[in-house]
């Protein structure tokens, strides 16, 4: 992109700066539009499962409800508690929002449709996603209130616990694909299952890892049945209790952007990314980014369905599941997959 702006007569510094801003906008604007749509889908799915209609007034079929809510919170007053640490209190939602957007830079939406196609893309996503807990801890501490503080401590313990098992699961994928590059991981899944299925989910060794990864994503994003950081009956609204206006909205945008990010990682790592489900020539006439969007939104639908139907875990059950079930299982499969690859000589 820098070369394109240089052809317009800009020197290298201005071309690089303009290309960087353009790249940020190319990622941020579509992600924000997608977040607005998935919030609408989330509310519609919850309404349907609860035998309600969901949003249906603002715009056709209620499609503009998210934009109306965004305008409402934008016009509201930002209220800061008198005992709060003002600087950190206002910085926390910004950190959560920015971290959720930055990780999208390496996600391939299609063949060549990636902002930064780096060789350590998976490692980058893992590192960036683990920073999201800082915004939550900052919010809980700066609010100077017991409910947000308890929520922040829960969030920190929960995210750290499941990051470990997610790390081992991703090692399994990297061992099989032979690369950290997300685009190359997608290409490695072409015709992987019986020579016709595009995706690692068909692999008898990697399918259990996908199940663990999907459940870990629910815990990582604090979604039901692991939404203990926002347990209304215990913690009011959790770390968001003292927030209002755009500060509250930034937390919501960051939360849903992070959910979409992990849904897209499910697509890229286990379900063939932009590749069609079956390696059949007519299916390749459908643009790759459409396959990517369809798979990602199907995963988001699963998130919403689980949120509406599965009861919340107790906190001790959550910790036990992470440390006594997921961690040993993921570590066991690292050894199993490593042994299989060494025995068969199959790498990448």
From Swiss-Prot:
Catalyses:
a quinone + NADH + 5 H(+)(in) = a quinol + NAD(+) + 4 H(+)(out)
Could you tell me which Pfam families the record lists for this protein? NADHdh
**UniProt keyword annotations, A-Z:** Cell inner membrane, Cell membrane, Membrane, NAD, Quinone, Translocase, Transmembrane, Transmembrane helix, Ubiquinone
What membrane topology does the annotation report for this chain? Multi-pass membrane protein
Compartments, record wording: Cell inner membrane
Q: What is its main location?
A: membrane
The UniProt record lists the EC number as 7.1.1.-
Recorded GO CC terms = plasma membrane
Matches recorded under PROSITE patterns: COMPLEX1_ND1_2 (PS00668)
Q: Which residues cross the membrane?
A: 21-41, 87-107, 120-140, 166-186, 195-215, 258-278, 288-308, 325-345
Gene Ontology MF annotations: NADH dehydrogenase activity; oxidoreductase activity, acting on NAD(P)H, quinone or similar compound as acceptor; quinone binding
Q: Name one GO biological process term.
A: aerobic respiration
Quote the NCBIfam families the UniProt record gives: PRK06076.1-2 (NF004741), PRK06076.1-6 (NF004745)
Tell me, in a sentence or two, what this protein's role is. NDH-1 shuttles electrons from NADH, via FMN and iron-sulfur (Fe-S) centers, to quinones in the respiratory chain. The immediate electron acceptor for the enzyme in this species is believed to be ubiquinone. Couples the redox reaction to proton translocation (for every two electrons transferred, four hydrogen ions are translocated across the cytoplasmic membrane), and thus conserves the redox energy in a proton gradient. This subunit may bind ubiquinone.
Q: Report quaternary structure and partners.
A: NDH-1 is composed of 14 different subunits. Subunits NuoA, H, J, K, L, M, N constitute the membrane sector of the complex.
What family does the database annotate?
Answer: Belongs to the complex I subunit 1 family.
Please give the name of this protein.
Answer: NADH-quinone oxidoreductase subunit H
- Which species is listed as the source? Erythrobacter litoralis (strain HTCC2594)
The primary gene name is nuoH
